[in-house]
């Protein structure tokens, strides 16, 4: 009788352990879809959170992917984000304006940017900003192999430490907003959160700038709680508008979080 009871107990125990092993088994990263998505936004009406693009039913937060920051009715926050693919001579002015308004931000930098502007990147960190990963070669990420995605992230990360002495903050912005389930999963496996945006406009062409007033109107028309604006640091219009934008948002009761 005791033997039968022990055997039954052992069988149940093995089932429990086996179930845990199955649930904890890691799916190979290479098995995730490489279907390409380009991040975009639905129309943002009445200062409400816009809808983003992605796979149907995708719960992006489960994959550590975000386009709206943490906020509440009592805690109104804007999360300023700047993309730095190359330096056009405006970043010092941007940093000065942020400091004047006591505003913190995250700067997403490429390896080339780090290598060419280590002093500026150090300044970002020393002034309390986050510095995130914008990859090594600025590729469209969706179709890349697992190893290539890892290399794009890791080499930029290594350059950050080598050239500035600072560790890269664990946030990545995929170039051009291009992603797949594979690229997001690989970033997550490396300890990164993928950061998209909830406000963007045509600002990255240095030869065809939208103008200071256009930028200000965009923020006044489409601001919302938890907003993550995509701001290219190479833009003259953004640089000229930033002070007025920050003053407007503060007047509306927002603080600037990271």
Please give the residue ranges for each predicted region.
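Short amphipathic alpha-helical segments
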Residues: 93-95, 184-185, 242-243
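Short phosphate-engaging motifs
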Residues: 21, 116, 179, 237-241
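Sec-dependent N-terminal signal peptides of Gram-positive bacterial secreted proteins and lipoproteins
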Residues: 2-22
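Catalytic grooves of carbohydrate-active enzymes
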Residues: 223-258
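Metal-dependent polysaccharide deacetylase catalytic core of the NodB/CE4 family, i.e.
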Residues: 76-78, 88-90, 99-213, 217-231
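N-terminal pre-catalytic segment of deacetylase/amide-hydrolase enzymes
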Residues: 18-81, 86-96, 100-102, 116, ...
């Amino acid at each position: 009788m005791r033997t039968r009871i022990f055997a039954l107990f052992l069988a149940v125990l093995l089932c429990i352990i086996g179930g845990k092993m199955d649930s904890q088994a890691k799916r190979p990263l290479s098995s995730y879809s490489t279907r390409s998505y380009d991040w975009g936004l639905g129309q943002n009406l009445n200062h409400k959170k816009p809808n983003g693009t992605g796979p149907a039913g995708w719960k992006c937060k489960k994959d550590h992917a975000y386009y709206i920051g943490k906020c509440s009715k009592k805690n109104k926050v804007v999360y300023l984000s700047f993309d730095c693919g190359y330096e056009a001579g405006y970043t010092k002015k941007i940093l000065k304006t942020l400091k004047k308004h006591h505003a913190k931000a995250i700067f997403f930098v490429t390896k080339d940017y780090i290598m060419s502007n280590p002093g500026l990147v150090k300044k970002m960190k020393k002034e309390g900003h986050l510095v995130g990963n914008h990859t090594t070669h600025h590729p469209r990420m969706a179709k890349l192999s697992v190893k290539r995605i890892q290399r794009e992230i890791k080499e930029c990360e290594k350059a950050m430490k080598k050239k500035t002495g600072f560790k890269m903050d664990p946030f990545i912005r995929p170039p051009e907003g291009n992603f797949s389930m594979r690229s997001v999963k690989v970033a997550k496996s490396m300890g990164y959160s993928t950061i998209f945006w909830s406000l963007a406009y045509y600002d990255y062409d240095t030869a065809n700038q939208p103008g200071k007033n256009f930028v200000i109107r965009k923020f006044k028309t489409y601001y919302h709680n938890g907003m993550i604006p995509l701001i290219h640091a190479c833009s003259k219009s953004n640089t000229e508008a930033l002070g007025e934008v920050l003053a407007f948002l503060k007047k509306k009761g927002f603080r600037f979080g990271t």
